[in-house]
């Protein structure tokens, strides 16, 4: 895991990640603007843009497309899955988060993990 692309306002995302001691695990942390969260613009209309921004920053040259073949979006809502699709990324839904398995499948997640262990197996071993 190298990047976070969250619909939460970026300052809050950074605080949450820091609180749990994961700051050093990520090269890039992107979130929405404070006003976007208040209008729900980020979760509905900007998720794809936030993902694209994170990929551009992660690439080091602003070229998000250069990472497309080496990137997977892991998310717990339909917005995450739809944002991945908008960026031509494969996606894994995590049903132990905010959204349900049904929501993730209906949004088009290629795979859904019910537990952290399931996610680990999917990512490291290619298991379903």
Regions found by a protein language model. Give the residues of each.
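Substrate-recognition "cap/lid" segment bordering the active-site pocket of phosphatases
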Residues: 3, 10-72, 78-86, 101
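Structural detector of well-ordered beta-strand residues that form the stable sheet scaffold
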Residues: 3-5, 92
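N-terminal processing/targeting junctions
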Residues: 6, 31, 125-128
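Short secondary-structure boundary segments
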Residues: 7, 33, 95-97, 116
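Structural recognition of alpha->loop->beta junctions
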Residues: 21-31, 103-123
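Generic C-terminal helix-cap and adjacent flexible tail
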Residues: 61, 120-128
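Acidic, Mg2+-coordinating phosphoryl-transfer loop and its flanking beta/alpha structural elements
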Residues: 73-113
């Amino acid at each position: 895991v190298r990047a976070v692309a969250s619909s939460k306002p970026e300052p809050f995302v950074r605080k949450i990640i820091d609180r749990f001691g994961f700051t050093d695990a990520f090269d890039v942390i992107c979130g929405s603007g404070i006003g976007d969260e208040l209008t729900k613009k980020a979760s509905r209309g900007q998720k794809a843009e936030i993902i694209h921004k994170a990929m551009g920053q992660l690439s080091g040259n602003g070229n998000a497309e250069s990472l497309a073949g080496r990137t997977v979006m892991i998310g717990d809502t339909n917005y995450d899955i739809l944002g991945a699709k908008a960026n031509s990324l494969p996606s894994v839904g995590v049903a132990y988060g905010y959204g349900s398995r049904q929501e993730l499948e209906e949004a088009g997640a290629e795979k859904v993990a019910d537990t952290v262990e399931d996610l680990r197996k999917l990512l490291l071993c290619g298991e379903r």
